[in-house]
Amino acid sequence: MSAAPLDYKKALEHLKTYSSKDGLSVQELMDSTTRGGLTYNDFLVLPGLVNFPSSAVSLQTKLTKKITLNTPFVSSPMDTVTEADMAIYMALLGGIGFIHHNCTPKEQASMVKKVKMFENGFINSPIVISPTTTVGEVKVMKRKFGFSGFPVTEDGKCPGKLVGLVTSRDIQFLEDDSLVVSEVMTKNPVTGIKGITLKEGNEILKQTKKGKLLIVDDNGNLVSMLSRADLMKNQNYPLASKSATTKQLLCGAAIGTIEADKERLRLLVEAGLDVVILDSSQGNSVFQLNMIKWIKETFPDLEIIAGNVATREQAANLIAAGADGLRIGMGSGSICITQEVMACGRPQGTAVYNVCQFANQFGVPCMADGGVQNIGHITKALALGSSTVMMGGMLAGTTESPGEYFYKDGKRLKAYRGMGSIDAMQKTGNKGNASTSRYFSESDSVLVAQGVSGAVVDKGSIKKFIPYLYNGLQHSCQDIGCESLTSLKENVQNGEVRFEFRTASAQLEGGVHNLHSYEKRLYN
């Protein structure tokens, strides 16, 4: 005779009689002696209690010791992923982009400057012109800088006596390029007095409905400027990653660890760089340790992300040297063949967990780099302890990534390649370019590839793709029962958030199956 069912009202009380919570703790899951190395596909996070809307989930997180982002999304410093356009929109959408260094130092610095000039608070060094500047010269400047509002001072310098303002409306229909701006400029532009706050300045722009607010001192000398376009960007991109002091967009860039990279970094810092990545496939080297020491002595305010690493021993050396953040991953990227060719690396889930467990004790945020293919992988990387997730392949093929689209077999594609591919190594010559220095191959007569070249399908703009990732990650945290990335980390460590190991058949079950055909649309 079967036992009578228990009183349903005592279900919660009965649950307490179990010796442990359902599923595995993160420590049990990541026991390499039992399960070996794990990737993101090898496990799932178990659901928790949902008692809040997904829109309430905060995705604020640390990039480095001093830099906080509103989203954990970071674009990779690859020459087919991140240049100025990608870095601009990654920052506007709450993340940050790291501009690649497979180009000349001046080209890279120019891209950093373009990001920093895209959005400002007070523009303390506005580009000014003199009354004798011609309309033709202004048109050239408009094409060069991407904007057309230029203050006019007596000597064409700032600070300098303000005499007017030239905007696109002043020159839009002028065909005579030889005219000087003193004949066409607005002679009484709207001004504010030096010392007003950013909030007060923006309020003047709203009330006057003008495009520019010129800030002058008591003697009428131009000292700075506010732009209405920046005010609109503030409204359209509320999560934007900005400097707390300048209100400019945050921008990162990568450099190598050879001597020439020191001068490259000087140019990047002059352009306004906020954070630098030391770009090495194997970050635990004397070259990187020496570079960290030099940067800390030369640019003490510049944040440094070191790597790549996959073990806590690697991490310990870089943390002790003064790294402000770590980049985790070796051979897990979709275009990377390091594990295959070099027999060196680590499954990404195991690498992220072990390095983060160590680094987080020292307050050093970690970035999971490689192996991320979807929102679920992002969630798992963050649950294992990383603070941010770097994406290469996920952002390749977007409108903002470098390169031109081409068609093959009816598909619209863009090139995507690993920085360890032969193509990338030979882009600017073998000696000391970004790819050869990243893989310590500057002096090699025969190059050994650690990456491949390929193509990816057009993904559209990240202006749609990043919000899709953002909303998806919020829903994922809601399912787990965590209202923030901070609480996700805490609840993983204290055992509240549980995991389950997936067998091969479980992975098949968790994907689309038993359909004749289907269309997989991720977002509209």
Swiss-Prot record:
The keyword NAD applies. Pathway: Purine metabolism; XMP biosynthesis via de novo pathway; XMP from IMP: step 1/1. GO terms for molecular function: IMP dehydrogenase activity; metal ion binding; mRNA binding; nucleotide binding. IMP binds at S334, D369, G370, G371, G392, G393, Y416, R417, G418, M419, G420, Q450. Its cofactor is K(+). It comes from the Eukaryota. The active site is at C336 (thioimidate intermediate), R438 (proton acceptor). One of its GO terms (cellular component) is cytoplasm. This is Inosine-5'-monophosphate dehydrogenase 4. It comes from Saccharomyces cerevisiae (strain ATCC 204508 / S288c) (Baker's yeast). The lineage of its organism: Eukaryota, Fungi, Dikarya, Ascomycota, Saccharomycotina. The gene is IMD4.
